[in-house]
């Protein structure tokens, strides 16, 4: 987590009201990782998102799956296309199984990010897997 975000870590029950009632340190860390990804810092996003996914207070399956979609994008954009496609395929399967339409939309955007490598073996395998899941 970045130095600026470190002061957000001590969240107590008084802070959990209204719009941010379901936010905890882990969810904030996922948000930071997503921002790093979108700011073109995939290596930093990989570290941040992996850390978030390993924390004990990762109590929301939806947040974990969103983190895994963004982690897959970060792997792919950092040159680890095979790992990115593997993580995205596994996550897409989980999202489809639970009927998480917002998560599937997020995964579709991740697939769009890897379009420049559409003829590479890992991407072709991912696309075949997605087609079979959607069939």
Model-derived features: positions:
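Conserved binding/catalytic microenvironments
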Residues: 1-135
């Amino acid at each position: 987590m970045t130095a600026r975000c470190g002061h957000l870590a001590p969240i107590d029950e008084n802070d959990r009201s209204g719009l941010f009632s379901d936010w905890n340190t882990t969810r904030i860390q996922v948000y930071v990782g997503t921002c790093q990804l979108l700011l073109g810092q995939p290596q930093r996003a990989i570290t941040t998102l992996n850390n978030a996914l390993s924390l004990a207070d990762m109590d929301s399956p939806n947040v974990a799956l969103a983190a895994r979609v963004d982690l897959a994008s970060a792997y792919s954009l950092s040159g680890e296309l095979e790992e990115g496609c593997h993580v995205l395929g596994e996550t897409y399967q989980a999202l489809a199984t639970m009927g998480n339409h917002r998560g599937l939309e997020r995964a579709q955007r991740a697939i769009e990010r890897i379009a420049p490598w559409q003829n590479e073996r890992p991407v072709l395998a991912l696309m075949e897997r997605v087609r079979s899941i959607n069939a």
